[in-house]
Amino acid sequence: MTTILQINSSARSQGAQSTLLANELTAKLQQSNPGAQVVVRNLHEDALPHLDDAILGAFFTPAEQRTAEQQAIAARSEALIAELQAADIVVIGAPLYNFGISSQLKTYFDFIARAGITFKYGANGPEGLVKGKKVFVVSARGGKYAGTPGDSQTPYLTTFLGFLGMTDVSFIYAEGLNMGPDAASAALAGAREAIAAA
């Protein structure tokens, strides 16, 4: 059975275009994969703490030497990793904030990027250990940045996901959402065309 993991990373609890479009894409993928199981990870509702001394200490302390607090921190990270590893398809709702990703998504990435678990270093450099997944990134944007130096989100996500082994990544953009009603309508229509073709 196909498992679809949808990761919502907007700071908004309601009305986020990236989340709404990610929902539509997940529904489309369910139609294409009858019986698919959907798991939703909402990074707004289930907020993760930013990296600090305690979290780094938990990650870099050998399992048998961790305190109870460190074990709880590591267990949260490992549960997120297991959820990701179990997915066949990953849908990431990723609004463009200040030319990058949300802090919610960055913190999630910090919790799943674990040496020896999701990547490792070998004689030829790093090797991603999260393989065999199709990833869709749905990016909602107030302006138009794709293909310009203002879009640092796309190369960052491509690099990070590829570092973990996820190299089959497709981007769906809804750009110009804050550039007037006509531009917003055109942006959503274009995104929905891409979703229909996914």
Curated annotation (Swiss-Prot):
The reaction(s) this protein catalyses: 2 a quinone + NADH + H(+) = 2 a 1,4-benzosemiquinone + NAD(+); N,N-dimethyl-1,4-phenylenediamine + anthranilate + 2 NAD(+) = 2-(4-dimethylaminophenyl)diazenylbenzoate + 2 NADH + 2 H(+)
Keyword match Cell membrane: no
InterPro entries assigned: Flavodoxin_fold (IPR003680), Flavoprotein-like_sf (IPR029039), FMN-dep_NADH:Q_OxRdtase_AzoR1 (IPR050104), NADH:quinone_OxRdtase_FMN_depd (IPR023048)
EC number annotated for this UniProt entry: 1.6.5.-, 1.7.1.17
Keywords from the UniProt entry: Flavoprotein, FMN, NAD, Oxidoreductase
Cofactor: FMN
Note on how the cofactor is bound: Binds 1 FMN per subunit.
UniProt record similarity statement: Belongs to the azoreductase type 1 family.
Purpose of the protein: Quinone reductase that provides resistance to thiol-specific stress caused by electrophilic quinones. Also exhibits azoreductase activity. Catalyzes the reductive cleavage of the azo bond in aromatic azo compounds to the corresponding amines.
Complex and partners: Homodimer.
Identification of the protein by name: FMN-dependent NADH:quinone oxidoreductase
